[in-house]
């Protein structure tokens, strides 16, 4: 028992440089990339071996057909490619030369585009190992592989049956304050089915609302017993409660819908103004989707290739802040890029951003990036213990005979 305690304690002394399950777009022709496990667009892109497929959807902003091929790579818990594996270790079928064949051109849209859809598994490839996966899409008509690299998409696959039991609880009675600005996670992990003999065999990731910028990696448990770990008063598992995500729904080009102030046509584009976001001194319950988005229009028929693209204008009323203000959501892919950064107007005391987006439902929040790279909540957005945050826990395991990490446990608390 003493040896087990020592080994497991050492696990939580390790740190990792770049935890990131983040999609990345390399070519500006690609828009509205979405990765969904089954039909659950409100959660992380997670499925199980033999379970529902992973769906990958995106638009190419031309009406030209492009021969897009894809390559799938297995990654370890730290999202590094599992270089010790052969492709046959984690998949059956073909990899690297298969073409995305589900293609539809847009119909009667101001901006023509072509929609592509891919489901994994499919007739050409089936995954056989749990863990992290990264798919890269290439344009086969490009002169070279680097020029043809269009985007990467990431998802997670769990074991068919969980190899660990996970209990998660969130409380507003924290070790920092009581029913004020924070939420604290309490967890219990039963790993009695696993044989743990080395500190690198187990990795645990805790996410708030699917965000990787404030992910907690390998929090040290404060209680250990035979086959179990408990986190009851762990400072690393205390999160800022924040506030509910904001949201809008752009469904029609003729009249405003939820959260839309005005829609204008300037001769080339629809200009859609989202209602100005004002400071929120009090908590108001709102069942927003924690950064998720769903593509549809008022007709709700063939949404993928009938929805319009428009210029969406965001306005945030707030004093000038010491850091850069960014829009943040699943549809920004967790990235703090120039296109998501808001500009400040000294005359109106407001922040502004304009993005080219497709019709649909969108939820979002504002975050502030400081000069040192740290990410903070905006003071004007409020910080309330009642906020309905979502927490995800990923448990990775590498047996002594394994050459990479498997995803043996997954939990979600809403």
Task: Label each PLM-derived region with a short phrase.
Residues 1-22:
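Bacterial Sec-dependent N-terminal signal peptides
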Residues 26-76, 177-191, 299-314:
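Contiguous beta-strand segments within globular domains
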Residues 91-116, 212-224, 311-359, 371-401:
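Aromatic-rich carbohydrate-binding modules that target alpha-glucans
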Residues 77-79, 125-126, 139-150, 211-212, ...:
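Short acidic/polar inter-strand loop motif in beta-rich domains
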Residues 110-140:
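Ligand-binding face of N-terminal immunoglobulin V-set domains in extracellular IgSF glycoproteins
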Residues 157-180, 385-408:
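Low-complexity, Pro/Ser/Thr- and charge-rich linker/hinge segments at domain boundaries
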Residues 197-283:
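Long, internal scaffold/assembly segments composed of regular secondary structure
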Residues 272-321, 405-414:
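Basic K/R-rich, polyanion-interacting modules in nucleoproteins and related proteins
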């Amino acid at each position: 028992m003493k040896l087990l305690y020592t080994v497991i304690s050492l696990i939580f002394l390790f740190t990792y440089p770049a935890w990131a399950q983040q999609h990345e777009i390399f070519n500006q022709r690609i828009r509205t990339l979405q990765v969904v496990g089954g039909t659950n667009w409100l959660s992380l892109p997670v499925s199980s071996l033999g379970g529902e497929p992973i769906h990958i959807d995106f638009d190419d902003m031309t009406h030209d057909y492009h021969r897009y091929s894809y390559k799938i790579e297995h990654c370890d818990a730290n999202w590094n490619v599992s270089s010790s594996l052969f492709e046959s270790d984690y998949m059956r079928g073909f990899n690297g030369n298969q073409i995305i064949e589900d293609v539809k051109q847009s119909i009667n849209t101001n901006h023509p585009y072509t929609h592509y859809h891919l489901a994994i598994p499919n007739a050409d490839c089936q995954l056989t190992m749990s863990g992290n996966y990264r798919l890269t899409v290439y344009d086969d008509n490009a002169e070279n592989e680097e020029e043809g690299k269009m985007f990467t998409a990431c998802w997670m696959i769990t074991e068919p049956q969980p190899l660990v039991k996970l209990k998660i609880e969130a409380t507003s009675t924290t070790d920092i304050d009581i029913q004020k600005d924070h939420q604290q996670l309490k967890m219990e992990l039963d790993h009695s089915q696993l044989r743990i003999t080395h500190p690198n065999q187990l990795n645990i990731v805790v996410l708030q609302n699917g965000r990787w910028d404030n992910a907690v990696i390998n929090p040290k448990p404060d209680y250990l017993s035979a086959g179990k770990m408990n986190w009851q008063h762990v400072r690393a598992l205390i999160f800022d409660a924040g506030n509910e995500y904001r949201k809008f729904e752009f469904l029609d080009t003729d009249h405003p819908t939820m959260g839309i102030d005005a829609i204008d046509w300037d001769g080339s584009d629809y200009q859609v103004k989202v209602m100005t976001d004002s400071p929120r001194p009090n908590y108001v319950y709102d069942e927003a989707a924690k950064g998720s988005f769903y593509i549809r229009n008022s007709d709700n028929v063939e949404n993928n290739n009938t929805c319009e693209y428009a210029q969406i204008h965001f306005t945030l009323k707030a004093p000038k802040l010491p850091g850069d203000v960014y829009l943040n959501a699943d549809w920004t892919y967790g990235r703090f890029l120039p296109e998501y950064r808001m500009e400040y107007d000294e005359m109106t005391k407001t922040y502004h951003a304009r993005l080219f987006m497709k019709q649909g439902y969108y939820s979002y929040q504002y975050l502030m990036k400081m000069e040192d790279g740290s990410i903070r909540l905006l003071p004007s957005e409020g910080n309330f213990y009642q906020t309905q945050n979502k927490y995800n826990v990923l448990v990775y395991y590498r047996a002594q005979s394994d050459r990479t990490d498997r995803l043996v446990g997954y939990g979600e608390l809403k």
